[in-house]
């Protein structure tokens, strides 16, 4: 059976800590979408690990880790991540169906961002998915055969010829790209496998599989705040499509949310706080992107969006992250509905334009940092947790009270 860990905000919810905390109980940890535009930060024994492509289970020697078919892979960045760990042989596997991000994709991404102003990381994620959908992409499996790779590269060079100048690729692009693969393909080849068959077999044997997503539900290409979204499907349903596991294989769906809310880049954010309180949340919560180091926009918990995300994913339980960031705040707001042109909205709309938050205010608490038992939390903190659980209609299964792995309350 497989369990899914999915972000239910705009990403950066703390999925990495939860996966790291529970990964020891699983045989496989699988990253099922996105690219190196996303980042997980894990603190283990006082050491901070920033992962962009590798699944969070790499810190457990007995855990097998898979990068599945719907992930887009920068081979250079993956090789650099691999070099930071020892003994990944037979512990890390990259799907032969996963698509390869080319330097051209990053150039195209930056070019398009100048006019679209979506707020992308400019790492080539979107353009790589574009080539995938156009059936012209290079897959990881193509790197296993030099002849096939050369054929794919020649087709790529022909296709981009009209755009080389616009994207600033330079006269030596073909030579440089061949050199790029010559340098990195041999390093990555030992990890490329038919992961779909591996996971189907593992599921049939009854092995435990943990599927981890990147970004968050509200960035889903179809169901998020379009056009300010990522280029992949980020919900729990996409875990099946990417891995080859059928929907019957899914058991638990753990939705990850912060006790407040953040967003990186442009796009609507009804509960954003642009006062000094937003700055306080950013500073205390260390809200700066793992990948880009960009400051995150900060605000209050949005229950309209949270209920929508829980419904989309079929969440069976929630993980409430960074409760400690709210320590010491006298009045804590929660967005319980929107107002748009005089109308109260309690359902999440397809367009958030003109949506203003309607808040309910709670009394704060002094300290929750490092607490590991629910009964040790102050009454106001427990009331806040109970309110979220009641309004969303999904039980809270665990609460994080610091970046440390062990500072977690299990309910």
From Swiss-Prot:
This is Adenylosuccinate synthetase. SUPFAM superfamilies: P-loop containing nucleoside triphosphate hydrolases. Its main location: cytoplasm. Pathway: Purine metabolism; AMP biosynthesis via de novo pathway; AMP from IMP: step 1/2. The keyword Acyltransferase does not apply. It is found in: Cytoplasm. IMP binds at residues 12-15, 37-40, 121, 135, 215, 230, 294. Plays an important role in the de novo pathway of purine nucleotide biosynthesis. Catalyzes the first committed step in the biosynthesis of AMP from IMP. Keywords: Cytoplasm, GTP-binding, Ligase, Magnesium, Metal-binding, Nucleotide-binding, Purine biosynthesis. It comes from the Bacteria. NCBIfam families: PRK01117.1, purA. Its cofactor is Mg(2+). It is an enzyme of class 6 (ligase). Binds 1 Mg(2+) ion per subunit. The lineage of its organism: Bacteria, Pseudomonadati, Campylobacterota, Epsilonproteobacteria, Campylobacterales. Its EC number is 6.3.4.4.
């Amino acid at each position: 059976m497989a369990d899914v860990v999915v972000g239910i905000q705009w990403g950066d919810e703390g999925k990495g800590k939860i996966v790291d905390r529970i990964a020891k109980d699983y045989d496989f940890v699988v990253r099922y979408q996105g690219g190196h535009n996303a980042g997980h930060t894990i603190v283990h024994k006082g050491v901070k690990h920033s992962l962009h492509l590798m699944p969070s289970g790499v810190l457990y020697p007995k855990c097998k880790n898979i990068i599945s078919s719907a992930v887009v892979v920068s081979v250079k960045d993956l090789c650099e991540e691999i070099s930071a760990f020892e003994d990944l042989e037979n512990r890390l596997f990259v799907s032969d169906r996963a698509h390869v991000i080319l330097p051209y994709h990053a150039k195209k991404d930056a070019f398009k961002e100048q006019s679209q102003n979506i707020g992308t990381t400019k790492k080539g994620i979107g353009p790589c998915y574009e080539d995938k959908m156009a059936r012209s992409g290079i897959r990881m499996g193509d790197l296993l055969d030099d002849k096939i790779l050369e054929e794919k590269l020649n087709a790529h060079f022909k296709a981009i010829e009209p755009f080389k100048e616009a994207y600033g690729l330079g006269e030596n692009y073909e030579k440089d790209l061949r050199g790029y693969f010559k340098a990195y393909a041999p390093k990555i080849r030992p990890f490329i496998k038919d992961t779909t068959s591996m996971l189907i077999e593992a599921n049939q044997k009854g092995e435990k599989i943990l599927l981890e997503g990147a970004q968050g539900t509200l960035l889903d290409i179809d169901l998020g705040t379009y056009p300010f979204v990522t280029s992949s499907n980020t919900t729990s349903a996409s875990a099946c499509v990417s891995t080859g596991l059928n929907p019957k294989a899914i058991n638990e769906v753990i939705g990850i949310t912060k006790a407040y809310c953040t967003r990186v880049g442009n796009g609507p954010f009804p509960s954003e706080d642009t006062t000094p309180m937003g700055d306080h949340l950013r500073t205390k919560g260390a809200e700066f992107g793992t990948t880009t180091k960009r400051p995150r926009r900060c605000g209050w918990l949005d229950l309209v969006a949270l209920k929508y995300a829980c419904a989309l994913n079929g969440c069976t339980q929630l993980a409430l992250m960074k409760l400690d960031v709210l320590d010491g705040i006298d009045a804590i707001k929660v967005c319980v509905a929107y107002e748009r042109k005089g109308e109260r909205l309690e359902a999440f709309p397809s367009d958030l334009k003109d949506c203003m938050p309607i808040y309910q205010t709670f009394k704060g608490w002094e300290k929750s940092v490092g607490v590991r038992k629910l009964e040790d939390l102050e009454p106001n903190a427990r009331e806040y947790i109970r309110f979220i659980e009641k309004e969303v209609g999904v039980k809270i299964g665990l609460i994080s009270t610091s970046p440390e792995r062990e500072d977690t309350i299990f309910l």
